[in-house]
């Protein structure tokens, strides 16, 4: 939509490219390349305060063009920072399909955070790694994280896969604090889920003990009391 591609910077503190406060409203599709995104295709750098309202459809074309589709950045590598971006377009792809980010390549193992972003568009895939915010990361577990992001769009895949979630599409992506899943959305396999002790006062005949997540924070229950 805005930038076709850039590759630079092998440290998370190095951003030789910055895309800031840009808007795309045009529809996108790719039949040959790395896939479509409203703001940047194959990209290394920072993306801040950008908005996409265009629809992306990469369900036709070569196998390569069907791999990465997203509302903001389709395929990221090396130093990547996505902050304060919003997608409201419908995102339709095959594999590595995300409302904000399609895939983070292995790169040099730099830590990356997708933060303060919102997806309001539907996200549809046909294979593995489909998510409302970040679909996939090839880096070591936890090096890529999603924090303070909101997904309000329905996420679906026509393929049989457990790699699908309202926030992330792979367990290699860590979930930080402040993430929100919109009311009424279907729970998906990779969503943060409580252990079933949501209401410690409802079970009056037994003592509740355990640990669960609430709004991205760990809650400890001991003898029916939350800590």
Predicted regions and their residues:
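Predominantly extracellular beta-rich ligand-binding scaffolds that present long acidic/polar faces
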Residues: 1-194
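C-terminal outer-membrane/trafficking sorting elements
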Residues: 198-227
